[in-house]
């Protein structure tokens, strides 16, 4: 609601977290699905074709649920360049919402790039239910890129929208609890061990899948 006028389009990249469609519909937006490539990397050509005069926002999720894909610096940089071009063509602001509850859960030395370095109109949304292993505890934060010209206006909208959620707002105690834990995360060694065991055994059995780079999901071909 902080970004959309009723009926404006939100691009989501398939495969995606299934609840995105309900969030968008609940806030008056129109869903536009764009498939990723076979390895689940961004299909920039398909994204470019999907962006039109009614597009307002793209949602990305990295590391991805359900694929475990981590978008690279190059992909994010190219996406930022594409959006800059499209903003000039369409004469309208285009925003990226980066959903990153798994940002601290990545494997094999892979680091999740900061969206703020590559996309000017970006909003980072995260939840500590994953990186602090607090399943179902919806405590997190939203952050707006300092490069965004209308950052103050967007933040005001986000704050107001959060207030309208009422009883689901984080209590003061939870806010105090997570503040000193911003640089902490669960020990991901157990997650990586489980990923390796499942990946190695399932591929040995003949299943085909892209090896997850983060999160805790496997997405085999059916």
Predicted regions and their residues:
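Phosphate-binding glycine-rich loop
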Residues: 1-9, 23
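Short beta->alpha connector loops at strand-helix junctions that form conserved
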Residues: 14, 29-38
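Conserved coil-to-alpha-helix start sites within the AMP-binding
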Residues: 16-20
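Active-site pre-lysine segment of PLP-dependent enzymes
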Residues: 25, 32, 41-54, 66, ...
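Conserved PLP-binding catalytic core of the aspartate aminotransferase-like
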Residues: 38, 191-192, 196-199, 204-222
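Short beta-strand segments
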Residues: 59-61, 95-100, 126, 211, ...
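Conserved core segment of the aminotransferase class I/II
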Residues: 120-192, 196-205
């Amino acid at each position: 609601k902080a970004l959309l006028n009723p009926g404006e389009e939100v691009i989501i990249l398939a495969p995606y977290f299934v609840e995105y469609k309900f969030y968008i519909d609940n806030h008056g937006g129109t869903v536009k699905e764009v498939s990723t490539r076979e390895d689940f990397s961004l299909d920039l050509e398909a994204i470019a074709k999907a962006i039109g005069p009614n597009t307002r926002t793209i949602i990305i999720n990295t590391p991805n649920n359900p694929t475990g894909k981590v978008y690279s610096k190059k992909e994010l940089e190219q996406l930022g360049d594409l959006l800059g071009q499209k903003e000039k063509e369409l004469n309208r602001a285009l925003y990226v919402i980066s959903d990153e509850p798994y940002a601290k859960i990545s494997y094999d030395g892979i680091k999740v790039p900061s969206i703020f370095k590559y996309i000017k109109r970006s909003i980072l949304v995260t939840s500590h239910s994953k990186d602090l292993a607090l399943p179902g505890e919806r405590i997190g934060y939203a952050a707006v890129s300092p490069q965004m010209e209308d950052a103050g206006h967007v933040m005001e909208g986000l704050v107001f929208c959060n207030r309208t959620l009422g009883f689901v707002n984080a209590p003061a105690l939870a806010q105090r609890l997570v503040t000193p834990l911003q640089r902490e995360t669960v020990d991901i060694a157990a997650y990586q061990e489980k990923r390796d065991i499942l990946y190695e055994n399932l591929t040995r059995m003949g299943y085909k899948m892209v090896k997850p780079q983060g999160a805790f999901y496997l997405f085999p071909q059916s």
